[in-house]
Amino acid sequence: MDISAYQHMNIRMSTRGKRPLRNLTPNDKVRAIQRIHNGETKASVSRDLGVPESTLRGWCKNEQKLRFMCRQLGPDHLGIDTHTPPEKRAKFDLQLLPPKLATLPNYDDLGLSNFLFSATEFPTQKESLFEKLSLVEFVKKNGLHPSAIRELGDTHSLNAAANAVSGVDYSTNNMINQLTLLAQLNSKLSYQMGESADTDIKSPQSTTDITDTAREENSTKTSCPLLTVKNWAKDPAKRAHFNQATQLNPNNDKNNNAVDPSYSNLTTMKYPLIMEPVKSIYPETTVSAIPPPPFSTYSDLASAASAPTTDNDCQGAALLDWCKLFNASLNFLAFAAAAASMQPAGGTIPKSTATQLPATEADETYPFNNNLVKRLSPLAHSDASNESYFDSEPEDLSVRSCASVSSRNNSRSQTPDKSTATSIACLSDGEQ
């Protein structure tokens, strides 16, 4: 037997004269099957391979399995590219390619283009749409009341035409709207601070020499009040009580200044829960060490009470809307207004004058409107939270504003910082 005829078929002969070992690869078997498909007889192919014809027929029956085994071996062991037909070679090449991921179907191919909203009809401002959706989720989580949402919609509907023309984003417009509302409140505060700075510079340091011009300015301020920490929720119907509480009965304290003892009654009427423990611990002269603010006469108060109060109602309504929108309480509003009033207006007033600015706020100390207070802060009037409410920061700030009045009058004996510290210490001891 000629062994050279089997060299190209990768057949090894262990010894001469014996049948060759049939360690044919699947590639060799597939090549033999392809030769049969090309027209060669099975006898000639079986004679070349050295296998019986029955074995070759078995290979032809298992042709698909043999081709699968060739694909598993990889392209290095194939070698049948020239013998396979084009259609089978194309299918074979597709099996070797990496699998393609299924692409998403087109929107119009799904037959949804006849719907009300198509993919091409959406505006290009996608960020504004996402921000509106996030705003809706924010409102749901924070639990804003539906009435407040309707009021917010009414306020935004006024600027709808301007937004359509300018194309301003919804979140930016919302922020600008709220900053405008805050600017209106702070503009009233800064306007009053400017007037108070002028009156403090022009007025003498002693409180005993109060002129008629100062009384006229105070009367005009009480007739047309501005938004401050003390009168932002005032009730004009209760102004008549101040005529009885502000009868001047001068006493002399340890600094020899004119002191009104009825101011302690005023403080007790306004802050009853704070001043009762203070009165029980400290004597009457210690509580009444704060000088009284100058008030107008009974005729001026009567004329102011008969004047229309639309400005006050508008201020209360604007404040209530602000409170509903920001979900704030009375403590936060009083703290913000007091902090804004303590700062100098425009940054042009020196620091020595800025410490004296809240002195004119005592000119307009009116009782709080109970209805507005209850609507703004429901927890403030509950029996369980009275102590926590009066221990909060806005009440301390109001005491500081009153103490700044006494610091200006007692500047000959002590500094404003010391007077403020002593008044706060008295308040903390009284609360304990």
Swiss-Prot record:
SUPFAM superfamilies: Homeodomain-like
Keywords: Developmental protein, DNA-binding, Nucleus, Phosphoprotein, Transcription, Transcription regulation
Compositionally biased tracts (Polar residues): 202-211, 401-425
Region Disordered: start-end pairs: 195-221, 401-432
Glycoprotein is among the record's keywords: no
GO biological process, one term: segment specification
Coiled coil: none
Subcellular localization, as worded in the UniProt entry: Nucleus
Name of a matching Pfam family: CENP-B_N
All copies of domain HTH psq-type, residue ranges: 15-66
Record-annotated DNA-binding residue ranges: 42-62
Quaternary context: Interacts with itself, dan, ey and dac to form a complex (or complexes) containing the RD factors.
Function: Probable transcription factor with a role in the retinal determination (RD) network. Regulates ato expression and is required for normal R8 induction and differentiation. Danr appears to repress Dan expression, but Dan is required for Danr expression anterior to the morphogenetic furrow (MF). Dan and Danr lie downstream of so and require dac function for highest levels of expression.
Protein name: Protein distal antenna-related
Organism of provenance: Drosophila pseudoobscura pseudoobscura
Lineage: Eukaryota, Metazoa, Ecdysozoa, Arthropoda, Hexapoda
